[in-house]
Curated annotation (Swiss-Prot):
Belongs to the PrpD family. Involved in both the tricarboxylic acid (TCA) and methylcitric acid cycles. Has both 2-methylcitrate dehydratase and citrate dehydratase activities. Catalyzes the dehydration of 2-methylcitrate (2-MC) to yield 2-methyl-cis-aconitate, and the dehydration of citrate to yield cis-aconitate. Cannot form isocitrate. Uses either (2S,3R)- or (2R,3S)-2-methylcitrate. Pfam families: MmgE_PrpD_C, MmgE_PrpD_N. GO terms for molecular function: 2 iron, 2 sulfur cluster binding; 2-methylcitrate dehydratase activity. It is an enzyme of class 4 (lyase). It catalyses: 2-methylcitrate = 2-methyl-cis-aconitate + H2O; citrate = cis-aconitate + H2O. This is Citrate/2-methylcitrate dehydratase. The keyword Lyase applies. It comes from Bacillus subtilis (strain 168).
Amino acid sequence: MPKTDRVIEEITDYVLEKEITSAEAYTTAGHVLLDTLGCGILALRYPECTKLLGPIVPGTTVPNGSKVPGTSYVLDPVRAAFNIGCMIRWLDYNDTWLAAEWGHPSDNLGGILAAADYVSRVRLSEGKEPLTVRDVLEMMIKAHEIQGVLALENSLNRVGLDHVLFVKVATTAVAAKLLGGGREEIKNALSNAWIDNAALRTYRHSPNTGSRKSWAAGDATSRGVHLALMSLKGEMGYPTALSAPGWGFQDVLFNKKEIKLARPLDAYVMENVLFKVSYPAEFHAQTAAESAVILHPQVKNRIDEIDRVVIRTHESAIRIIDKKGPLHNPADRDHCLQYITAIGLLFGDITAQHYEAETANDPRIDKLRDKMEVTENKTYTEDYLKPDKRSISNAVQVHFKDGTSTEMVECEFPLGHRFRREEAVPKLLEKFSDNLKTHFPDKQHKHIYERCTSYETLQTMRVNEFVDMFCM
């Protein structure tokens, strides 16, 4: 057999052997866990999300199955991973990673939590000790790192592929480890994840933007669990899945460029991950949203007097969310820089409801969008790519018909950035509490919040007991 591709070897070594020593990474992972589950709980208010949940065949029962938070479903770990992953991503309100490729590393929690809960319940049935939340946090750190470091220099979007491939790869690696896989099983599963290929980005762009972007990560993380389970049954792998001449991923799909890990795998991504604290909007627009909300008091009574709105931004924002013309659904609207900015200017806040038809039918929104000029600021683009800065800058200025204007409101770092972490954490916990309140009775909400916000209690909790707290 040929020598295994280096990237597959490095990821396998990392998952099996790397000890995570960063206290900051574990603390941040705890916040990611709560924030991500809170986003999933909030999504249960939306029928378009909940219609996709549950067993694929009604009435299916699974002994020692994985439970789906916020529901009464007990599913096999593959289907549970889809359910949890779908909930997490539905409102585009969980964490974000921005680099040559974009993504949301907490999407991997769908597969991680489903696998960990399943393993814990099986162990208990055998009289063994279950996994703890600390084990989940470690796998979250590692999944974040795998997905995020792959994203640093490997741009899937440049070749029309969706970022959820990196979710599938990351989940595959850590799920195989959680389920009891060793070196060969993890390598075999990883090779199959690459050979699977990736979803196209068709559903993220006009004229086809649609709800698949809200369940694509659930699909990817569940596939990761599926491949991990297959490898544990002895399914073979393919050592040069990436590099095989003519037939490997690199030659067929990546313009014959090498897939590489831009830095050693440790805890960099979890330490630097971006939270969506304030607004459920595509992350490249977060600072535009903050700027627009700041300007709201100055413009709210002068909307009809606006001549133009100037937005200065970075190249990635222009490529992903600079949209003109009709927007067809919530998935289209929450990925439109101009729509998000207009909502901030008009209402002084941005919530998930603002993407629904009731708000979108307000004629003032499209009138404002038509008056917007989006231009690239080269410095913003450069700072976006600097590893020690990673800013996501936007600036907004409103010009009126009488020749006056507001100041140019610039925001470099959104509230969820590492540079603003101390400021963000109290608001992040408030967001978690608010999301719980949308679904759980007061007593259950209080019980979950108190146990989860004590870090020592959280990390030592058994996984099955942690999940049980969130179930109906």
